[in-house]
Amino acid sequence: MTVRVRIAPSPTGNLHIGTARTAVFNWLFARHTGGTFILRVEDTDLERSKAEYTENIQSGLQWLGLNWDEGPFFQTQRLDHYRKAIQQLLDQGLAYRCYCTSEELEQMREAQKAKNQAPRYDNRHRNLTPDQEQALRAEGRQPVIRFRIDDDRQIVWQDQIRGQVVWQGSDLGGDMVIARASENPEEAFGQPLYNLAVVVDDIDMAITHVIRGEDHIANTAKQILLYEALGGAVPTFAHTPLILNQEGKKLSKRDGVTSIDDFRAMGFLPQAIANYMCLLGWTPPDSTQEIFTLAEAAEQFSLERVNKAGAKFDWQKLDWINSQYLHALPAAELVPLLIPHLEAGGHQVDPDRDQAWLVGLATLIGPSLTRLTDAATESQLLFGDRLELKEDGQKQLAVEGAKAVLEAALTFSQNTPELTLDEAKGEINRLTKELGLKKGVVMKSLRAGLMGTVQGPDLLQSWLLLQQKGWATTRLTQAIAAE
């Protein structure tokens, strides 16, 4: 048997981290087994589905490195398949027309609530006679289509993550709606609904394994009945744990960040997000391993090692993983990733003219980055010819010998336009010896004169970057003139 799995998002919003994590697990399982990973867009909610969300979902999956083998398939392009299946169920007596109005259904729920009963449809239109149906139609009522659910039926499946799951038919809320009422009196029924469409798609696409969130367990019980009724093979199910916030509640928009776009804007690399999502519910065979590519994770992946318990989202862990990927990037590859964040922080750069300088900057600040958004802050002291003296810098310039260091460094900078690291290091050693100062005094004074503070990135590399831009001499001049 060739494994066939699918990720089936609804384009009613941008790619959510929960959907992305489900996509990661499906992708890993498909690659581990040599199977097929299918993208299916469940866009039957015509009011909320939008083309821009469809595009966002696809681009988000691609950004994460989750390439699909088949698709994307769109449910709105398969409506005939669903209508055919609904008609089949009607012809077999497994589905029927229900003419209940929304007011009647609300009255039903209120009566059940008053008796402390769980809300459910009471199946009152299950066995209407043709005359009763005709009378209801004469009132102008348009029917929904409901699928018969046997309250006595016990639905059992062996979940690949949760073990045996048992669901009682009486707990499914009564006969379920599988098609809306049509606004057109000439049509037998309206828009097919989620549970029916999903099952028809899975049968037509020969899906062998359905890997999705545990919030779909009730849907699975309903869908198993539909697979059987339509004569399709029931796939193997695996229900993954929910992603939780630090309080142990389901991660939601109230937590501030939920879409992949949000994480991207916050400066996370796709490799880091994909890596972290692997660990949100799955434990590698080597539980100490935390950094791996998707391909490396796929070699080890199994559903048996996916946890049942909810996976708490850990920002510190994600930050650490992201920093590992950032620190491993060659400076030349880091540069194009930094530029948007440098510009967002108010630093203007010319990638063509400043390429070598930017590589030097990336080399300098790269090891201190946790997120790409840190770039503007980490490089703050290295842009512009204006010296902003902080309090610690002013104090350092008042130390005996500090101004002599700056004057000598200014002369040296003016005479050495093509400064190298070795030359900068040699000048510091020369000043230490000739001025009779401690090396720490020389370095702190020079740092204060170049960057306005005694704290900051590596002094020698910073001096080179400022010298290459012509900012070193300007800043040193300002520092010497400072009172």
Curated annotation (Swiss-Prot):
<keyword id="KW-0547">Nucleotide-binding</keyword>
<comment type="similarity">
    <text>Belongs to the class-I aminoacyl-tRNA synthetase family. Glutamate--tRNA ligase type 1 subfamily.</text>
</comment>
<dbReference type="InterPro" id="IPR008925">
    <property type="entry name" value="aa_tRNA-synth_I_cd-bd_sf"/>
</dbReference>
<dbReference type="GO" id="GO:0005829">
    <property type="term" value="C:cytosol"/>
</dbReference>
<dbReference type="InterPro" id="IPR004527">
    <property type="entry name" value="Glu-tRNA-ligase_bac/mito"/>
</dbReference>
<dbReference type="InterPro" id="IPR014729">
    <property type="entry name" value="Rossmann-like_a/b/a_fold"/>
</dbReference>
<feature type="binding site">
    <location>
        <position position="253"/>
    </location>
    <ligand>
        <name>ATP</name>
    </ligand>
</feature>
<keyword id="KW-0067">ATP-binding</keyword>
<dbReference type="InterPro" id="IPR020058">
    <property type="entry name" value="Glu/Gln-tRNA-synth_Ib_cat-dom"/>
</dbReference>
<dbReference type="InterPro" id="IPR020061">
    <property type="entry name" value="Glu_tRNA_lig_a-bdl"/>
</dbReference>
<keyword id="KW-0648">Protein biosynthesis</keyword>
<feature type="short sequence motif" description="'HIGH' region">
    <location>
        <begin position="9"/>
        <end position="19"/>
    </location>
</feature>
<dbReference type="InterPro" id="IPR045462">
    <property type="entry name" value="aa-tRNA-synth_I_cd-bd"/>
</dbReference>
<dbReference type="InterPro" id="IPR000924">
    <property type="entry name" value="Glu/Gln-tRNA-synth"/>
</dbReference>
<dbReference type="Pfam" id="PF00749">
    <property type="entry name" value="tRNA-synt_1c"/>
</dbReference>
<dbReference type="GO" id="GO:0000049">
    <property type="term" value="F:tRNA binding"/>
</dbReference>
<dbReference type="InterPro" id="IPR020752">
    <property type="entry name" value="Glu-tRNA-synth_I_codon-bd_sub1"/>
</dbReference>
<dbReference type="InterPro" id="IPR001412">
    <property type="entry name" value="aa-tRNA-synth_I_CS"/>
</dbReference>
<dbReference type="InterPro" id="IPR033910">
    <property type="entry name" value="GluRS_core"/>
</dbReference>
<protein>
    <recommendedName>
        <fullName>Glutamate--tRNA ligase</fullName>
        <ecNumber>6.1.1.17</ecNumber>
    </recommendedName>
</protein>
<dbReference type="InterPro" id="IPR020751">
    <property type="entry name" value="aa-tRNA-synth_I_codon-bd_sub2"/>
</dbReference>
<dbReference type="Pfam" id="PF19269">
    <property type="entry name" value="Anticodon_2"/>
</dbReference>
<keyword id="KW-0030">Aminoacyl-tRNA synthetase</keyword>
<dbReference type="InterPro" id="IPR049940">
    <property type="entry name" value="GluQ/Sye"/>
</dbReference>
<keyword id="KW-0963">Cytoplasm</keyword>
<feature type="short sequence motif" description="'KMSKS' region">
    <location>
        <begin position="250"/>
        <end position="254"/>
    </location>
</feature>
<dbReference type="GO" id="GO:0004818">
    <property type="term" value="F:glutamate-tRNA ligase activity"/>
</dbReference>
<dbReference type="GO" id="GO:0005524">
    <property type="term" value="F:ATP binding"/>
</dbReference>
<keyword id="KW-0436">Ligase</keyword>
<dbReference type="GO" id="GO:0006424">
    <property type="term" value="P:glutamyl-tRNA aminoacylation"/>
</dbReference>
<comment type="subunit">
    <text>Monomer.</text>
</comment>
<dbReference type="GO" id="GO:0008270">
    <property type="term" value="F:zinc ion binding"/>
</dbReference>
<comment type="function">
    <text>Catalyzes the attachment of glutamate to tRNA(Glu) in a two-step reaction: glutamate is first activated by ATP to form Glu-AMP and then transferred to the acceptor end of tRNA(Glu).</text>
</comment>
